[in-house]
């Protein structure tokens, strides 16, 4: 379990209606209107036994200017971090840690792969390069079909 202490999950596609505010209303509008390089407040997700009784801190950050993206949610990433210590599980993450994680994610947004992939606005460069490498190792559709 301690191996996940410094692991952060980043989602390029997500359902914005799942994040609720204090009044249990959808935060989708707040997420869509995020200014460039701003983040939402983090919230604690407690999935229960199904997920090993591990809580998560979840927040959203805009990494691309909205006027250059195809949809209101393009250019926004969902960030998740497992809350590993008892203090974190009880109180959540400190804002300073969330800000540091967010700043590091923002720093990984360049260079841009614009035009190479329809999801370009949500790419983090190291992840994009890893995906490209992995895909380059796949057999082409024609080669795969000819195996049968």
Question: Model-derived features: where do they sit?
Answer:
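Long, contiguous domain-sized segments
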Residues: 1-148
């Amino acid at each position: 379990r301690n191996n996940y202490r410094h692991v952060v999950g980043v989602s390029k596609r997500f359902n914005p209606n799942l994040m609720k505010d204090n009044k249990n209303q959808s935060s989708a509008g707040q997420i869509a209107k995020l200014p460039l390089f701003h983040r939402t407040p983090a919230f604690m997700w407690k999935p229960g036994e199904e997920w090993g009784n591990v809580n998560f801190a979840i927040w959203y950050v805009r990494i691309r200017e909205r006027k250059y993206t195809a949809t209101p949610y393009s250019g926004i990433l969902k960030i998740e971090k497992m809350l590993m210590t008892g203090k974190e599980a009880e109180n959540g993450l400190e804002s300073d840690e969330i800000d540091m994680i967010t700043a590091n994610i923002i720093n990984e947004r360049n260079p841009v792969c614009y035009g190479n992939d329809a999801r370009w606005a949500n790419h983090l460069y190291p992840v994009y390069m890893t995906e490209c490498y992995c895909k380059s190792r796949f057999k082409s559709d024609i080669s795969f079909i000819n195996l049968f």
